[in-house]
């Protein structure tokens, strides 16, 4: 897991870049989330920032929905929403008890990690408006891949949201020179994807087509996480 100082740097940096991309064309369509305009995306992230700030401060329920921030309001408050989130994350000890909806440690560190990846993916989304999104930083993407399996797949199976499979997904992460093996949740026939950490994280989050990185094995397995 990325340490807290790096997490805060990443959240702040990606949060600012997201705003820059949206403000360059707030009415532009987010290619990776075509139902959203840039202004809609900014409003969504403002809602996430407000929700998590309140949760860390003990003012929100873990099962509450993100506040629905009107796009016109978010255009004015986003910078302050982001700054409050970063400050609250900085001031909250990683081992402080904070409720979480997932099968994960119920501590602030779990949310600090989630915020990094939320902002990284949505920064990438925002930059699709201009047509040339920069990759997610390798260290962030590697941890984002780990979080996907450790938190989302585990919770999805435990909650009955995704059917368990006797199958194994192998990720060959080219820029890191590593190979990650994930059972879903039982060992079975292997399906292999190969790509950079950023590309594979984005494929897991349905921002990139996983078939573009398919090497061998059951192509149908690549649809398995779409219900998570």
Where are these regions (language model features)?
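Non-cleavable N-terminal signal-anchor transmembrane helices
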Residues: 1-25
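Amphipathic, non-membrane alpha-helical segments in soluble helical-bundle scaffolds
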Residues: 4-12, 35-42, 71-79, 109-112
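Alpha-helical packing segments of well-folded alpha/beta enzyme cores
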Residues: 14, 18, 48, 78-81, ...
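Short, contiguous alpha-helical
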Residues: 16, 24-64, 102-159, 200
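Hydrophobic/aromatic-rich structural module bridging two neighboring secondary-structure elements via a short loop
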Residues: 55-111
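A mid-sequence, solvent-exposed acidic-amphipathic segment
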Residues: 148-177
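Acidic/His-leaning functional-site neighborhoods
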Residues: 168-198
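C-terminal interaction segments
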Residues: 189-228
């Amino acid at each position: 897991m990325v340490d807290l100082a790096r997490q805060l740097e990443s959240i702040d940096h990606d949060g600012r870049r997201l705003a820059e991309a949206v403000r360059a064309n707030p009415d532009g369509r987010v290619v990776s989330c075509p139902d959203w305009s840039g202004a809609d995306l900014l409003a969504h992230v403002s809602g996430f920032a407000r929700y998590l700030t309140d949760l860390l401060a003990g003012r929100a329920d873990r099962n509450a929905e993100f506040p629905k921030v009107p796009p016109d309001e978010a255009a004015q408050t986003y910078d302050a929403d982001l700054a409050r989130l970063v400050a609250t994350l900085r001031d909250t000890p990683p081992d402080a008890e904070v409720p979480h909806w997932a099968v994960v440690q119920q501590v602030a560190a779990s949310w600090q990690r989630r915020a990094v990846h939320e902002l990284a993916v949505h920064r990438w989304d925002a930059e699709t408006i201009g047509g040339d999104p920069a990759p997610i930083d390798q260290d962030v993407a590697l941890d984002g891949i780990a979080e996907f399996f450790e938190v989302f797949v585990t919770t999805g199976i435990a909650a009955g949201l995704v059917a368990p499979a006797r199958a194994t997904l192998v990720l060959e992460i080219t820029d890191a020179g590593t190979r990650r093996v994930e059972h879903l949740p039982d060992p079975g026939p292997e399906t292999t994807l190969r790509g950079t950490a950023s590309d594979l994280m984005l494929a897991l989050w349905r921002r990139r087509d996983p078939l573009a990185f398919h090497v061998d094995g059951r192509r149908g397995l690549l649809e398995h996480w779409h219900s998570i």
